[in-house]
């Protein structure tokens, strides 16, 4: 008679993200002891960690922490949405986020190298990799500060954790505007805050492409400069937050929205899990 039930298998899968057969075998070997089964999965899973290095971690979640004028965001990637929504992976994300806040991490490299209870965060991820049987990464960390920081998390499905996260720093406290701009940023995916933030070489590349395209379209030479400038401005509208049409009211821009509220965005960050 089996020393475990179907509910035990389900619970072990939810805790670890490991495959069903692996969970069954671990429960058999541990004689139904769930904690021992988790340890067995870690030990056996460690052997396959190297093989998982080349696999694609295109799922995951984004977690955020805000406290007044501070915002911290971490991105965790895994291979499948099954693991992404598992209790073990979600708990891991909270551990990583708490550590990012505690050590004031500003990038993934410093966070992964930081000490967490006698081991590094990277070693914690390696253990999770072994237990869950998937490649797990923390590719990005953001830490922004301002007078007020707003956050927004977006779910693509109700049964999955948030996969898009945004932090927006303002120079004044305004929850409504902060939330509106954060939601807009999640939807419209700007790359830069102002056009001055766009690298000069990128602007020159867009200008060159616009001119070459216009010439291929046989646009009149007399109108060339105006056409090129218009297309470069379109690039700014697509990629610069302050110049984008506001998602909730395209007749106004983010700049005008902020001006009407008397606030400024000083910085922002947007992550998408799996990217």
From Swiss-Prot:
Keyword tRNA-binding: no
InterPro entries cross-referenced by the UniProt entry: EF-Ts_dimer_sf, Transl_elong_EFTs/EF1B, Transl_elong_EFTs/EF1B_dimer, Transl_elong_Ts_CS, UBA-like_sf
Location of region: Involved in Mg(2+) ion dislocation from EF-Tu: 80-83
Pfam family, one: EF_TS
Keyword Protein biosynthesis among UniProt keywords: yes
PROSITE patterns documented for this protein: EF_TS_1 (PS01126)
Primary localization class, coarse: cytoplasm
Keywords (A to Z) from UniProt: Cytoplasm, Elongation factor, Protein biosynthesis
Entry-linked HAMAP family: EF_Ts (MF_00050)
PANTHER family (UniProt xref): ELONGATION FACTOR TS, ELONGATION FACTOR TS, MITOCHONDRIAL
NCBIfam families, A to Z: tsf
Function: Associates with the EF-Tu.GDP complex and induces the exchange of GDP to GTP. It remains bound to the aminoacyl-tRNA.EF-Tu.GTP complex up to the GTP hydrolysis stage on the ribosome.
This protein's name: Elongation factor Ts
Naturally occurring in which organism (per UniProt): Kineococcus radiotolerans (strain ATCC BAA-149 / DSM 14245 / SRS30216)
């Amino acid at each position: 008679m089996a020393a475990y039930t179907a509910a035990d298998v389900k619970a072990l899968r939810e805790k670890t993200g490991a495959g069903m057969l692996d969970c069954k075998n671990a429960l058999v070997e541990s004689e139904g002891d769930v904690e021992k089964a988790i340890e067995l999965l870690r030990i056996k899973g460690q052997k396959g960690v190297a093989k998982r290095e080349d696999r694609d971690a295109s799922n995951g979640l984004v977690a955020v922490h805000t406290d007044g004028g501070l915002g911290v965001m971490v991105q965790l990637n895994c291979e499948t949405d099954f693991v992404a929504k598992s209790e073990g992976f979600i708990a891991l994300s909270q551990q990583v986020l708490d550590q990012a806040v505690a050590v004031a991490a500003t990038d993934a490299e410093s966070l992964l190298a930081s000490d967490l209870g006698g081991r590094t965060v990277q070693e914690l991820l390696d253990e999770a990799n072994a237990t869950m049987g998937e490649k797990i990464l923390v590719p990005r960390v953001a830490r922004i500060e301002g007078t007020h920081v707003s956050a927004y998390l977006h779910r693509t499905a109700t049964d999955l954790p948030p996969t898009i996260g945004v932090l927006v720093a303002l120079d004044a406290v305004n929850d409504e505007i902060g939330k509106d701009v954060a939601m807009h940023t999640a939807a419209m995916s700007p790359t830069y805050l102002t056009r001055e933030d766009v690298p000069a070489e990128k602007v020159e590349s867009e200008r060159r492409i616009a001119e070459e395209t216009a010439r291929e379209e046989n646009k009149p030479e007399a109108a060339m400069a105006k056409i090129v400038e218009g297309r470069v401005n379109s690039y700014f509208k697509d990629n610069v937050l302050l110049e984008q049409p506001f998602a909730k009211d395209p007749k106004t821009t983010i700049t005008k929205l902020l001006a009407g509220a008397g606030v400024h965005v000083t910085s922002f960050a947007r992550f998408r899990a799996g990217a």
